[in-house]
Amino acid sequence: MASEQTLSIIKPDAVQNNYIGEIISRFEQAGLKIAAIKMTTLTKDQASKFYAIHKDRPFYNDLVNFMSSGPVVVMVLEGNQAIAKNRELMGATDPKKAEKGTLRADFAESMSRNAVHGSDSSETAEEEVLFFFKPDEITHR
């Protein structure tokens, strides 16, 4: 199986609640490797560009405000089936519907404050990784 990369964001709610280490441990225990990582606070402009796909949705402004409300941890995860593995680890968008043991079931407060973001396809993964990282900032492990 070929190795692939995906983007993961630990959102402001999970950063504020000091879940960074526990979330990263779950990724590593699942066989995903961190190829790049940084902590940053998104500007509203950055958040609006990153989530532009949702601009016509009713939750868009709240999402932009939330994602720019505090620090986030942005990572490139690498491994076999990294995208699917990350999505499985995250669980359903709504933590009330997420399976027990998933990141959102364990660490999310609500559907809008749901702890983590993950790319949903190889196309979006490539775009999202390049949104946050230059190619020379990514280490292949």
UniProtKB/Swiss-Prot annotation:
Pfam families: NDK. One of its GO terms (cellular component) is cytoplasm. It catalyses: a 2'-deoxyribonucleoside 5'-diphosphate + ATP = a 2'-deoxyribonucleoside 5'-triphosphate + ADP; a ribonucleoside 5'-diphosphate + ATP = a ribonucleoside 5'-triphosphate + ADP. Its cofactor is Mg(2+). CDD domains: NDPk_I (cd04413). GO terms for molecular function: ATP binding; metal ion binding; nucleoside diphosphate kinase activity. Keywords: ATP-binding, Cytoplasm, Kinase, Magnesium, Metal-binding, Nucleotide metabolism, Nucleotide-binding, Phosphoprotein, Transferase. It is found in: Cytoplasm. The keyword Signal does not apply. It comes from the Bacteria. ATP binds at K11, F59, R87, T93, R104, N114. The active site is at H117. GO terms for biological process: CTP biosynthetic process; GTP biosynthetic process; UTP biosynthetic process. Belongs to the NDK family. This is Nucleoside diphosphate kinase 1.
